[in-house]
Amino acid sequence: MINRKAIGYITANYSSTYGSVLLKDRPIASVPFLGRYRLIDFPLSNMMNAGIKTVGVVMPGNYRSLIDHVGSGKDWGLDRKKGGLFMVPGNAYGTTKGGMRFLLRDIISNKTLFQRSDKPYVVMMGTNIIFNMDLNTIIDAHENSGAQMTVVYCKATRNVDDETKLEINENGRLTGVSAGVVYGDNASMDCCIVNRETLLEIIDHYQAADYLDLLEALQATLATSTCAVTSTRARSWACLARSRCIAAAWTCSTRP
């Protein structure tokens, strides 16, 4: 199955605000999980299961562990002549700046990836949250909403400073964005669907403010009501519950 509606964009150039010896020389995207997996396997697998065949991965300065694990993308069907896996440049400071998942500077630097696509949508994902989700359902919901962007969220189960709070009205429209969540808040899952043309407009508009994150730019856009943004709540089963269920949904690299 080939998804003819969307391309993928994964940000792998940031670390965690929580200190760990595992993060000393690597981004969070290449942190091991249950032995054989790395955290980047999960967004790649979600995109593979949705039939997305063009994926750009934003690389950090300390990219060796990612290259060693992902390779050519063969394990996700991304070693292709048309489309495939693209390792695109990222900004080194993005590896440690808390709360930043979709830096505009990275998006602007990789404008060509979006310009060359003939797909109408871009699926953007981070690598710090593990979940299994049918992205085709989210893409269809976005298409039916008529919004320029759809943000996936869940209810926060704890207080976290390094996550993004979403304010959502009774119609499911996003009305505000802020840093930090407490229990029960609407927490972004660092997954969104955006119209490709809208993303290109954002790139052109924010050339001089490329230090912002996409959601920070979104906050300014909401204030001027120039962009319609809807939201989709992730069902509770979308998050990891049992390790024995992983093999059916997720693919890991066969490389060492």
Features from the language model and the residues they span:
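N-terminal nucleotide-binding beta1-loop-alpha1 segment
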Residues: 1-34, 45, 50-52
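Extended, compositionally biased accessory segments flanking or bridging domains
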Residues: 36-37, 48-51, 62, 69
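Short, well-formed alpha-helical segments that are part of the catalytic scaffolds
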Residues: 39-44
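Short internal beta-strands
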Residues: 54-60, 151-153
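Acidic donor-binding segment of Leloir-type glycosyltransferases
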Residues: 64-87
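Short, hinge-like loop/turn segments at secondary-structure boundaries
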Residues: 73-75, 166-171
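Conserved beta-loop-beta/alpha segment of the NTase-like Rossmann-fold superfamily
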Residues: 84-165
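Catalytic-core segments of class I nucleotidyltransferases/pyrophosphorylases
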Residues: 139, 169-256
